[in-house]
A protein has these predicted regions:
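Short gly/ser-rich anion-binding loops that grip negatively charged ligand groups
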Residues: 68
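N-terminal domain-onset segments
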Residues: 1-65, 104-114
Length: 114
């Protein structure tokens, strides 16, 4: 898949998950983050890497935060933020519970869900 900058909606979701996880990321992460869509049936999952740390041999470390939201068609969605073995941002894993393509990322996220 093609590397690109994240969209505003993706940035909003990532910022929410990063803040929820209370991890430290560089102050310029928004400017330097490169995303690559995962082959997940268009549910919205992304590989994450900072532009100065492009490495294809990174390994999953752990999930550090997640949130739940409802897509515009009423289907539940779970978004998880994962880091690699070195503690760097690794994946935004989005799972729409009926496996259909994600329609939208909401403007706000409920901190009481999940």
């Amino acid at each position: 898949m093609q590397n690109r900058k994240m969209t505003q909606c993706e940035e909003r979701l990532l910022e929410f998950l990063i803040n929820k996880a209370s991890i430290k990321v560089t102050g310029d992460w928004k400017e330097n983050l490169i995303v690559s869509p995962m082959d997940d049936g268009n549910m919205g999952s992304l590989y994450l890497s900072l532009s100065n740390e492009m490495d294809t041999k990174r390994l999953f470390g752990e999930q550090i935060s997640e949130c739940h939201f409802v897509d515009s068609d009423g289907i539940d969605v779970i978004a998880s933020l994962n880091i690699d073995k070195n503690g760097k941002l690794f994946e935004l894993d989005i799972w729409k519970t009926d496996y259909t393509p994600l329609k939208r990322i909401p403007k706000k996220f409920d901190t009481n869900m999940l």
